[in-house]
Amino acid sequence: MPSDGRCWETLRALRNSSKGRLRYDREWLLRYEDVLEECMSLPKLSSYSGWVVDHILPNTSHHTQENAPSSDNSPSSGSASGLYQSTLKSPVRSSPQSPSPSTPSGTQSAHESPFTEPIALQSSRAIKVEGCIRMYELAHRMRGTEGLRQWQEEQERKVQALSEMASEQLKRFDELKELKLHKEFRDLQEVMEKSTREALGHQEKLKAEHRHRAKILNLKLREAEQQRVKQAEQEQLRKEEGQIRLRSLYTLQEEVLQLNQQLDASSQHKDLLNVDLAAFQTRGNQLCGLISGIIRTTLESGYPTAENQAEAERVLQEMRDLLSNLEQEITRASEMKKKDEEEARVKLQESQVQQGPGAPTKTSAPSPSLVGTQSEDLQVKVQDSTMQWYQQLQDASAKCVLAFEDLTSSKDSQIKKIKMDLQKAATIPVSQISTIAGSKLKEVFDKIHSLLSGKPVQSGGRSVCVTLNPQGLDFVQYKLAEKFVKQGEEEVASHHEAAFPIAVVASGIWMLHPKVGDLILAHLHKKCPYSVPFYPAFKEGMPLEDYQRMLGYQVTDSKVEQQDNFLKRMSGMIRLYAAIIQLQWPYGSRQEAHPHGLNHGWRWLAQILNMEPLSDVTATLLFDFLEVCGNALMKQYQVQFWKMILLIKEDYFPRIEAITSSGQMGSFIRLKQFLEKCLQRREIPVPKGFLTPSFWRS
C-alpha cells in the first residue's frame, strides 16, 4: 500500500535527521523526571489538521508518487527533498470568516471553493510528516478495527460453537437425567410393587393368624364363659350351702344356748344334793362363747365352711355330753343321797332295837352328804352387789329419761328450738376438749359447769340456760353424760391420748354434779357391759340380735359389726373409764375424795379376774385397762398389785390361751408381752398422753 511506503520513508528520514542521530541518556528519566513531566502534556494538532489530512495530503501523496524516481535505492531522499521544497500557506492565516473544516457546513463550503483565499501552509515536509503520522494512525486504527472485527467474529463463532456444544451437552444431560429418572421410577415402582406384594402376603398371613387367634379366642371365651357360669353356679351353690350352714349354725347355737339354760336350771339340785355343779356351768358358758366366736368369725369371712359346721356340731355334741354327764352326776348324787338316807334310817332302827322299847328316842340329824372337793373353776356371773349397783344406775338413767320426756316429745317449735340449743350447749364443749393447752381445757370446764349451775352461756351466738325449760337440767345432764361416753367410744378409740383430757373434765364435773357421774356410768355400762364387769346371759325366747346388742355389738339391718370395730369401741370406753378413776380436776379442792376413784378400778380388776375369760375380749380389755391405769394402781396398792399381776401371768394366762383361737392371738400376745416387760422392769410405765403439771400452766 502507498501509506506503508510513506511510513518507512518517514522513519528513515527521522533516523537520518540531526535529532535522530542524537544520543539519549537512559538515566536521564530518573534524574530529570520533573522536567519530563512538564513536557508530558499531550501534543495538540491544529484545528485544521483534519482538513489537511483529508484534502491536501492525498493530492501531495498522489503528486509524489507520480514524480517519484523508479529507483528503489533513493526513496528517502526524494521524500525529504519533496518535504523541504514544498511551501504552502498555513491554514492559520486564513480569514476568520472561513468556515471550520471540522463542521459539515464548513466542509461543504470548502468543496465548493477550497481556494477562495490564499492559505499559508507549513513546509511540505512537515505536512507530509504529519500526514504520514495521521495515515499511520489511521492505518493502524483500521488494522486494529479489522483485527477486532475478525476477533469478534472469531469469538462469536467460538461462542456459537460453545453454545451449540453446551446445548448439545444440555440435551445429553437432560436425556441422561430423564433416563436416570425413568430408571429410578422404574426401580421405585418395582420396589413398591414388591412391597405391595409383600404387604398383601403379610396381610393375608395376618388375616390367617387373626382368624386362627379369633378361633382360639372364641374357644377361650366360650371356655371362660362356661367356667364363669360354672363358677357362678358353684358360687351360688356355695352361697346356698353357706346360708344353709349359717342357718344350721344358728340352730346349733340356739340349741347350745337352750342346753346351757338347762345346765343353769340344774343348779337347783346343788343345794339339795350337796354337789358342786360349777364345773359344768363354766364349761357350758365356754361352749356358748366358742360357738358364738365361730359364728362371728364366719360372718366376718363370708359364709361358714363345712369345718365350721363340723366344729359347731362338735360343740353341740360336747354340750349334750356335758348335760348328759350332769344328769348322770345328779342321778348318781341322788342315788347316793337316797342310799345314805337309807343307811341312816337302818342304823337308827338298829340303835332303837338295841336300846329297847323303853329307852327314850333321840332325834338324830341326817348324816352329812359327801362334800365334793372345792372346784378351782371361776364363776361366770357377777356378784349380786355389783348387779344391784348396775341395776340401780340403769334405773336412774331410765328415770332421768322419763323426767324430760315432755321436752323431747313436744311438737311445739319453740320448745324444739330450746331443746336443740340445750343439746348443742351440752355437747359442743365436750367436742372441743383437746390437749392444746390447760387454759383451753379450763374454759371448756367452766362453760359446762356454768351451764349445769343454771347460768346462761353462749352457744352458737345465742344465750342458753337450763332454766328456759323446767326439764332442761335433766336433759342437759343426760346428753352431757351420753356425749362423754360417745367421745370415749369414738375419739378415744381412734386416739388413745384423748382419754386423759376428756376424763379429767368428766371427773371434775362428776365431783361438782354427782348425777352426771351416775349417768356417765349408766351409759358406759349399757354400751360396754364389760366395764361393770358383766357378761349378759342368753335368756330363753330372746332374739339373737337383742342378745348381741346386750353384749355390746352394733346390729344394723340384722348385720353385726365386725369384731375389730367392736373391740376398738370397747377399748376406747375402757380406756376412758380407766382414766376417769385416776384423775381429779386440778382446780378443785384437794381434800375432797374422788367420787369414783382407784378403789373401783381395783374392784373391777379383781372381779374380772374372778370370772371366766372371753375369747379376744378379756385380753384386749385387760391390756387397755392396765396400760392406762396400771401405773396409778401400782403406786396405790404396791405389793398387792404385783401379786395380782403374777396371778394374771401364772393362772389367768393359761385360761385365756385355752379359749383363744389361732386367729385371735394378737390381743393375748400383746397383753402377755406388756406384763412380762413390766415384771422384768418392776414398773408399769406412765401412759402416753398423761397430763403433766406443766400442761396446766400452758
Swiss-Prot record:
Coiled-coil segments: 152-274, 305-355
Compositionally biased residues, Low complexity: 67-82
Extent of Basic and acidic residues compositional bias: 333-348
Gene Ontology molecular-function annotations: identical protein binding; inositol hexakisphosphate binding; phospholipid binding; translation initiation factor binding
Subcellular location: Nucleus; Cytoplasm; Nucleus, Nuclear pore complex
InterPro entries listed in its UniProt record: GLE1, GLE1-like_sf
Superkingdom of the organism of origin: Eukaryota
Gene Ontology, cellular component aspect: centriole; centrosome; ciliary basal body; cytoplasm; nuclear envelope; nuclear pore cytoplasmic filaments
Subunit and partners: Associated with the NPC, however it may not be a stable component of the NPC complex since it shuttles between the nucleus and the cytoplasm. Interacts with nuclear pore complex proteins NUP155 and NUPL2.
Similarity section: Belongs to the GLE1 family.
Name of the molecule in the record: mRNA export factor GLE1
Organism encoding this protein: Rattus norvegicus
Gene name linked to the record: Gle1
